[in-house]
Curated annotation (Swiss-Prot):
Enzyme class name: transferase
Cofactor note: Binds 2 [4Fe-4S] clusters per subunit. One cluster is coordinated with 3 cysteines and an exchangeable S-adenosyl-L-methionine.
KW Iron-sulfur (keyword) present: yes
Matching InterPro entries: Aldolase_TIM, Elp3/MiaA/NifB-like_rSAM, LIAS_N, Lipoyl_synth, rSAM
Alphabetical list of NCBIfam families matching this protein: lipA, PRK05481.1, PRK12928.1
Source organism per UniProt: Danio rerio (Zebrafish)
Protein name per Swiss-Prot or TrEMBL: Lipoyl synthase, mitochondrial
Gene expressing this chain: lias
Any one annotated GO CC term: mitochondrion
Positions annotated to bind [4Fe-4S] cluster 1: 128, 133, 139, 374
Length: 399
């Protein structure tokens, strides 16, 4: 069974409930991964539970944002954003209110319904639904760019790590991998008729290669069914195992993504102790080293307390390491147990960082409050870029 990841970076918590509730954030996958999903159904969540454990899950579920938090309201129009007078930086003991620029529209559309129905029929899950991403209507519906995309999470719903921004459930030894998952995932993607697919996963430190072979098999199965579909892999760091990175980089993928998540100075505060900035840089550098034509991509969450100088320095290190594509989005607190949002960054500030990224030479920079590592508009741009490159390579070979 293919599951889904949180666009904020690692992976999302699996849910058997199929209600659409837009996410508070982050890919992940990426895109990022900041939203608690639960295995409780809508009907059971309203009935009293005799178990303290179930009560706790209900409490945590209610701590997060719901559909109404994200649906466009009276201040959602851009012309009215300046009227917002709520605090954007957190004071001690305070929990910030969601600003109007994080509002979105209810997802609709023919292609949206097609993907949703196929998921039900094949009993598959995507990061888009399970992370309750607010961009789901744009991505699934084709939207302005007429390029349908989805993000699939491989290797289960349980992570071996515990990052402080991510609500995915954790265990030292998650259930074993499903050997049929690569084939079944490729079958589902072929049925959807997608142009661009993102594969991501939880961390699986319990597996010798971290699941790299499983990733590679999935890419191969997808490409065998449709060589034209573009595949992005948003991978873990494999604890620095570059052989695992190489296996995926050479699997036939088009984009190799790995998220550094935050600035260098906040790594230990935000990520699991087994992850670090230099290890993530080595993953991105090695992917480019073994396959120079592959596009490398990473994502950063803003609003965790980073400074402008730290962001600038982080972007410089990423560019110096040969990273091609960059996304920056707003961090969202999934539950009260997770890191608080220190600041809601304004759209103007996100636009500033997008300009900085472009000037630094990133091939593509997407920066905005609702931008995630797996983001529709970015995939449209990358699709056109990759197709242009392939055409040029074919022409050069023919000559």
């Amino acid at each position: 069974m293919a599951l889904i990841s949180r666009s904020c970076g690692a992976a999302s918590r699996y849910s058997s409930s199929h209600l659409f509730l837009p996410s508070k954030g982050a890919e992940a996958a990426n895109v990022y991964c900041n939203r608690l999903s639960t295995a409780a159904s809508t009907s059971s969540s309203s009935s009293p539970s005799p178990s303290t454990h179930n009560d706790r899950k209900k409490d945590l579920r209610e701590d997060g944002l719901n559909l109404q938090d994200f649906i466009s309201g009276e201040l959602s129009e851009k012309s009215k954003w300046e009227e917002y007078r709520g605090n954007l930086k957190r004071e001690k003991g305070e929990r910030l209110r969601l600003p109007p620029w994080l509002k979105t529209e209810i997802p609709i559309g023919k292609n949206y319904n097609k993907l949703k129905n196929t998921l039900r029929e094949l009993n598959l899950h995507t990061v888009c639904e399970e992370a309750r991403c607010p961009n789901i209507g744009e991505c699934w519906g084709g939207g302005e760019y007429a390029t349908a995309t989805a993000t699939i999470m491989l290797m289960g719903d349980t992570c071996t790590r515990g990052c402080r921004f991510c609500s995915v459930k954790t265990a030292r030894r998650p259930p074993p991998l499903d050997p049929d998952e690569p084939y079944n995932t490729a079958k589902a993607i072929a049925a959807w008729g997608l142009d661009y697919v993102v594969l991501t996963s939880v961390d699986r430190d319990d597996i010798p290669d971290g699941g790299a072979e499983h990733f590679a098999k999935t890419v191969s199965n997808i490409k065998e069914r449709n060589s034209k579909i573009l595949v992005e892999c948003l991978t873990p760091d494999f604890r620095g195992d570059l052989a695992a990175v190489e296996k995926i980089a050479l699997s036939g993928l088009d984009v190799y993504a790995h998220n550094v998540e935050t600035v260098r100075e906040l790594q230990r505060h935000v990520r699991d102790p087994r992850a670090n900035f230099d290890q993530s840089l080595s993953v991105l550098r090695h992917a480019k080293k073994v396959k120079s034509s592959v596009l490398t991509k990473t994502s950063i969450m803003l609003g965790l307390g980073e400074t402008d100088a730290q962001i600038q320095a982080t972007l410089t290190e990423l560019r110096d390491s040969g990273v091609d594509c960059l996304t920056l989005g707003q961090y969202m607190q999934p539950t009260k147990r997770h890191l608080k949002v220190e600041e809601y960054v304004t759209p103007e500030k996100f636009a500033f960082w997008e300009k900085v990224g472009q000037e630094m030479g990133f091939i593509y920079t997407a920066s905005g409050p609702l931008v995630r590592s797996s983001y529709k508009a970015g995939e449209f741009f990358l699709k056109n870029l990759l197709e242009k490159r392939k055409t040029e390579e074919t022409t050069a070979t023919a000559e």
